[in-house]
């Protein structure tokens, strides 16, 4: 297993566990959480909860095998299952939001694309950050350099396509675009998403 893969495998259950804890308040009381798991195909929320649970289980087992240096014949099978579940996790939030027909701005498959690309980009960013903090450089993960550049570029194109598509889709979605670009959410959009999420990572990767 390569160094980059080892870091990714070991970091995945930790980050996913933190994300799962942040989602619990959205479900409300404990009874709602239990109900969600007891009805796995009742809604997209239930499917997402099961995806998170399965991913945590598989990722934790893989990380434990790597840390304990245990050779297991089913390791490749666990990798395959983990990859399938990971794809589901990347798509889940975008699919959930895009399925809400009552919100014109979200009702587009481009939202799924944007979430998937953003997830992949965050994964590359995590590996690079770990390399920089532990080695003072990301040269050990040089294979990810151009992958990171490509993902940032695709993310930017997808974001522009999403905004243009929503701008011409309806008056309501156009108002949502205006709120993001020029209104009350403009600071979060331009500083948080565009600058910190796309421009800064792209510059850091290019000048490393």
Label each region the model flagged.
Residues 1-51, 55:
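Membrane helical hairpin/interfacial module
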Residues 53, 58-207:
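Long, contiguous internal "core" modules enriched in hydrophobic/ aromatic residues
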